[in-house]
Structure formats: C-alpha cells, structure tokens
C-alpha cells in the first residue's frame, strides 16, 4: 500500500479521510498533511519498514509517522501502528550518530495545530512512541501504547501546549509520559491535562524533564493509575538498587525535575493510585546545566493531593534543591504510602551528597535509601505536608520525615 500517495491525493482534493482496511501491511515511513484523517479499521496493522535506509529523515529527524507544520490532522480507528523496533537494537554509529539519534521515533508531530489521536494502538517502536514537538492543540483519547522492545522506549513525550490526554493506556520500558522543554528552548509546555489514564513504566510513570530549558506551566495530572509495567526489556533494577522488592518496577511514579535552567509553576497532581515504583515522589531543582546569563530558574507552586500507593524500595520520596536553588510552595495533601521498611541506623545517619550537576533520578544520591523512610526534604521553602501518612511493611530505623535547610 502506497500510503503516502493516498495522503498526497487527499491533499490535492482539499483534504479528507484515508482509510486503511483490515489486514497487515508493511508501509514505508509517511507524512501526514493538513486536513487529512488517517482511519485505521479494526484489525488493520501498519508494519513499519525494518530497513533503516528507508528512514531518510525527510523531516529532519527519523520517524515512521510524521507531520510538520500541519493543521487539522488526525489518526483514528481501532487499528495498530507497529514499529517492529526490536530489529533496530543493534544500530549505532550510523553516520557518526549515537543509537538514540539513529533510531526512528514511531510517531513525531512537529509544530502542528489541531491534532487528534483516537482509539488506535501503537507498539514496538524503535525509540520513543509518540513525540508531540512544539504543537498547539492536541487531543489524545482512548489510545493504547505498548513500547517494550528497545532503548529509549518512552510512551509519550510532550513538548507542546494546549494538550488533553485522557482515557489512555500507556505501558513503556522508558518513561510513560515525559514532559520536556529541550527541542526549542523558548517553547513553553503549558495548559496540559492528563486524565483518567493507566500509566506504566520501567522508569518513571510521569516525568517532567530531564530536558528542562524552558517553562512547564499549568499542567494537571488527575484520576490516573501509575502502575507496574507489563513488560521489561532493558531494566533489572533489582540487580543494581539495594532493597528493590520486585523484579519489574519503575524508578519513580512521579518525577518533577528542573535541572537545565528552566522554570516550573502551577503543577497539580491529584487522585492518583500508585504501585510498582521504587520511589513514589521525586522533586528536584538543580543545575545540571546553567541558565543563560541573567535568567531565572525555579520550581514552585506544586500541589500533590489524594495520592496513594505502595513502593518497591527503601529509597524514600524526596524534595531537594541545591545551594542557591530552592523549590518553594510545594503542598502534599492527603497522601498515604506504604514502603518496604528495613532501613538501618547507618541509613538514618547517612550524609546525602549534593550532586548538583548529576543526572536526576530518585536513586541519584549514590543509590542510598536516604535518611528518611517517607520524605527527605533539603534546600526548600514553603513545603507543606497535610494529612500525609507513610507506613512501613517492616521495621525501619529511620524517621518518616527528615528536613535539612528547610524554611
């Protein structure tokens, strides 16, 4: 099936619907264009080419499904987009590129407006599953993702504004949903809602960062389940993280990170059920990279409420800044957690390194459990805990809360 030819023909007619009937078809990478809807029938499967030479980076970056600068485009229906990404595992050094650069993203939408994604499944990408890059106006509903075959198998990467994601099931080896501000360091991720979704990851279920050069503003995550992934290709944390209690688990259920000079303001996370992560909550403001001269970087005005879950390691939740950079205005309300326990007197007395320029993860502090079993807070202002309860499944010598340089 020459899908690109059919899309181009629809454009010549002024737009319309391109229908893919039931059945499997190997398809070359293609580009959606303005006013075109791709409709995948129930039982239709688009199989991505497994020849890297077919991914000629027509849009500047390799992807199977692409669009750039398009308006009023959609992918709908109950069919499947299959990246067959496992065959790309060994690719590296292509024209001097590293593996993540060389591997094609399954779907990438760049600077598009009025994008609609509904009801289909995407799976087995070579790299990221769906990259929403500097778009304005995105609705994703009832979409399923299963991305567990390769490096950097994120579910959704959001660098866009005015986005609604609801009733979706995202299961990924890397982050399930990652908000980033790195492709265009002046583009703000703002006015985003993620609602009523199942999010599963072997890394972070919901992550802001790591790329954090610009603004994250007015983002709401609500009524979601952050749960254990159903697959695991890359990560065996039980081998490298002391005290991990399950062979398949993620790093953090919720990770809020500003480490590249960006800004975060007005984040709401509420009505969350969590299971299958080493650490429930990780908040980090640091200076992996310095902001431009004279620019301000901050992480402030975060509300986390009605958050319940069971953790899979002794690594506590944390809210940390570094000297000169302090998260502020962080409220946790109605939070109920069960953690494994097992912390020792040595854990309670441990000195936590600053790691100002380190890559941020909840285990970044030399993989130590941290001096608290509940929350460790350092270099922060205006942190409010209201009706927060942390129980241990076994005895623990640490305190539930430890505060260091906190106002």
Residue ranges of model-derived segments:
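Extracellular/periplasmic carbohydrate-active domains that bind, remodel
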Residues: 1-407
């Amino acid at each position: 099936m020459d899908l690109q030819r059919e899309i181009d023909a629809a454009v010549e007619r002024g737009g319309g619907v391109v229908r893919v009937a039931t059945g499997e078809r190997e398809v070359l990478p293609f580009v959606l264009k303005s006013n075109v809807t791709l409709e995948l029938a129930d039982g239709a499967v688009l199989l991505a080419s497994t020849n890297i030479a077919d991914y000629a980076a027509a849009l500047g970056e390799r992807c199977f499904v692409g669009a750039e600068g398009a308006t009023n485009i959609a992918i709908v229906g109950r069919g499947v987009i299959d990246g067959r990404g496992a065959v790309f595992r060994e690719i590296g050094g292509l024209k001097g590129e590293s593996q993540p650069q060389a591997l094609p993203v399954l779907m990438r939408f760049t600077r598009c407006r009025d994008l609609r994604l509904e009801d289909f499944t995407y799976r087995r990408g070579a790299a990221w599953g769906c990259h929403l890059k500097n778009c304005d106006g995105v609705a994703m509903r009832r979409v399923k993702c299963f991305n567990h075959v390769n490096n950097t198998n994120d579910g959704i990467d959001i660098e866009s504004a005015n986005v609604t994601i609801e009733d979706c099931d995202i299961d990924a080896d890397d982050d399930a949903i990652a908000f980033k501000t790195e492709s265009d360091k002046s583009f703000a991720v703002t006015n985003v809602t993620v609602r009523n979704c199942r999010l599963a990851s072997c890394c972070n279920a919901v992550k802001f960062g790591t790329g954090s050069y610009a603004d994250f503003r007015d983002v709401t995550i609500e009524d979601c389940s952050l749960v254990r992934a159903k697959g695991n290709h890359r990560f065996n944390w039980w081998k490298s993280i002391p005290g991990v209690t399950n062979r398949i688990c993620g790093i953090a259920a919720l990770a809020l990170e500003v480490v590249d000079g960006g800004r975060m303001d007005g984040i709401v996370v509420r009505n969350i059920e969590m299971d299958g992560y080493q650490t429930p909550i990780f908040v980090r403001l640091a200076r992996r990279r310095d902001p431009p001269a004279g620019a301000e970087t901050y992480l402030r005005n975060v509300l986390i409420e009605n958050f319940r879950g069971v953790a899979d390691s002794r690594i506590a939740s944390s809210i940390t800044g570094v000297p000169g950079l302090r998260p502020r205005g962080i409220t946790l309300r109605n939070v109920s957690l069960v953690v494994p326990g097992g912390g020792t007197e040595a854990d309670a007395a441990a000195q936590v390194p600053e790691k100002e320029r380190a890559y941020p993860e909840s285990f970044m502090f030399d993989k130590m459990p941290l001096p608290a079993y509940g929350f460790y807070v350092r270099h922060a202002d205006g942190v409010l805990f209201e009706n927060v309860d942390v129980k241990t499944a076994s005895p623990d010598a640490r305190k539930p809360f430890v505060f260091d340089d906190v106002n």
